[in-house]
Amino acid sequence: MLGPILGDIVGSPFEFDHNNYKHKDFPLLSEKSHFTDDTVMTVAVAVIFLARTGRSKPEIKQYVEQTFGYDLNRTCDEIRPTYHHVETCQETVPEAIIAFLESVSFEDALRNAVSLGGDSDTLACITGGIAEAFYGMPQELRDETLKRLPED
């Protein structure tokens, strides 16, 4: 998963229209190169991959902590009292993973995520992706989800 992360770091100085540089002659890494929310979302994709390929929760937790340096030793009960709406992935993805790690089912994972407060839809979206890969999604909830999407 380092390829996408390095791509994010290399592309970061050129993000947004006013920074675009449409040539190939640029330093691959500079002082302006840094990871962005794209790297953090890549972590979420990595966790979904691990869940989909049959890794256990302890294996997923260990991989994320060792590879990405996230502290996943907090509990939902510890997060809830002080957590608030944060628009950075760095303060959303770990909490979403913790909501999954503490869950016992797909629905429980979503309830954990929303119960943290903060950016509830983003938390539940990330947690839902991981939980679906790990537990599967009940058909009734799948049907309800599809009903709420536009046909086009």
Spans of model-derived segments:
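Structured, active/binding-site neighborhoods that engage oxygen-rich ligands
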Residues: M1-D152
